[in-house]
Amino acid sequence: MSYRKLQRTSSQRRALLRDLTTSLIVNGKIETTEARAKEVRSTADKMISLAKKGDLSARRKAAAFMRDVVADVKEDGDNVAVQTALQKLFSDLGPQYADRNGGYTRIYKTMPRRGDGAQMVVLELVD
């Protein structure tokens, strides 16, 4: 299995991919460098494929990888419903992509970064 090292140690690289994948699932799109986006694309596709399975084993594998962050807060009078990134993945994204076999993300190139000229892209989930 080949992958990009992204100038980081394995633990730093794993943490970076966890954070970017979780941000992509919570927000629907992220802006990052091209190399990072191409790596996050593969991990995000794996997470959405787990969400499509929807069983307990898939939920535990996804929970072991993703960060435990709040994705959405809904207030209905006195009731407050908090949805985590994992819940959003399995309740919203899994059913949304049930008929799609891969290719859940799209990459758009944008302007180079001002400081170092690195190629920036927008990675977003396909509707």
UniProtKB/Swiss-Prot annotation:
Keyword Repressor among record annotations: no
Pfam families documented for this protein: Ribosomal_L17
Tree of life domain: Bacteria
Family the entry assigns: Belongs to the bacterial ribosomal protein bL17 family.
Keywords: Ribonucleoprotein, Ribosomal protein
SUPFAM superfamilies with a match to the protein in the record: Prokaryotic ribosomal protein L17
GO BP term, example: translation
GO annotation, cellular component aspect: cytosolic large ribosomal subunit
Name recorded for this polypeptide: Large ribosomal subunit protein bL17
NCBIfam families: L17
Segments forming a coiled coil: none
This protein's record includes keyword Amino-acid biosynthesis: no
Gene name tied to this protein: rplQ
GO MF annotation, one: structural constituent of ribosome
Quaternary structure and partners: Part of the 50S ribosomal subunit. Contacts protein L32.
